Amino acid sequence: LAERIADGGYEPIHTCAINLSGATIGDDTFLDFLREVQPRYGIEPSSVCFEITETSAIANLVNATPFIQELKALGYRFSLDDFCAGMSSFVYLKHLPVDYLKIDGSFIKDMLEDPIDRAMVQVINQIGHVMGKRTVAEFVETQEILEVLREIGIDYAQGYGLARPQPFNRNFLRETHVAAVASDTTSGR
């Protein structure tokens, strides 16, 4: 992708989210690779958001914090994926320097019928914002869920209700867009 964008084959993209495996945490060769390819292809680090699951980050907490700090020092953003799906603890969250909390879809999908799920989403969103993190709701499949997420103040959403997964090709880059949920994306949240 970086090669194609650098060669003028694709339009630059606003944000590219890349899932990392738990094995990547603490892998110095990965950091070296990023340091090498960034100047070669002119990758704007702020346009890349690395994602790691909460379970992987907590299982590797000793390495996760410095690894995330190093990525952020290089200008990349970081997201904690599937938050509250596994071993969640706000103690861990307090020490992980992530930019985004991706609220696990298991809370989102039934939040219209289940007041506990809705309350969990509200609380995670509030705590995330107090900590200076943006929130992302996974598994958004209906307009009704999207509207409730807007009311709650969730920053971003992803799911079939917004766009279906697509093969990666030239048209994908032209047609894809990120859905901001917050009614005022300049609010600083």
How would you describe each model-predicted region?
Residues R4-I5, G9, N19-D28, S47-L61, ...:
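EAL-family c-di-GMP phosphodiesterase catalytic domain
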Residues A6-H14, G42:
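Catalytic core regions of nucleotide second-messenger enzymes
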Residues F33-V37:
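A short, hydrophobic coiled-coil helix within the histidine kinase transmitter core
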Residues Q38, E44-S46:
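Conserved C-terminal helical docking segment of ANL/AMP-forming enzymes
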Residues A64-T65:
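Acidic, serine/threonine- and proline-rich low-complexity intrinsically disordered segments
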